[in-house]
């Protein structure tokens, strides 16, 4: 009888598939790459914006995580028949709290706050416009914060798809202070 029970236990251990509970453990790290739309989606319009970013996330207790990364945001402001680009290069660091996850540890929802600092360039530093007008906005160092709602969906043990909604507030520049971003990304667990 003991031999029969041992065979059943061994077969259950060998043939039940992978364990899904080994995700978001303390000190696990992942590299994520994101692409976002900034301040709405307006195909064909002159006021569209987008951003690209990369970050390193390190998990802590309870599935929470620290995230440190960099981001490039380009927002076009309409002016007559053309557009004036405003580019922001920022570094950010923040803490994200896990607010929801499923029992199999496939989907995680995070809410977090980040501090940001960087540089803003208006029209790539050119003050004179094509029609002879002069820009009074200047390039500047910027600082501020961001609130983020982030969703991770694991498609494999070391690969997760990301979706996020983010509100950035930055001071120091001459242009808009608030930027709403939404987008997608991919995360690779590296240890």
Indicate residue ranges for each PLM-predicted region.
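Short glycine/proline- and aromatic-enriched beta-strand/turn motifs that initiate or cap beta-hairpins
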Residues: 20-75, 187-191
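Predominantly the C-terminal beta-signal and adjacent terminal strand-loop region
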Residues: 73-75, 150-191
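Residues that define the transmembrane beta-barrel architecture of outer-membrane proteins
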Residues: 27-31, 46-52, 83-91, 107, ...
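Extracellular loop and loop/strand-boundary signature of outer-membrane beta-barrel proteins
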Residues: 40-42, 77-84, 131-137, 169-173
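Extended low-complexity acidic/polar segments
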Residues: 124-165, 188
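Cleavable N-terminal export/targeting peptides
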Residues: 1-28, 191
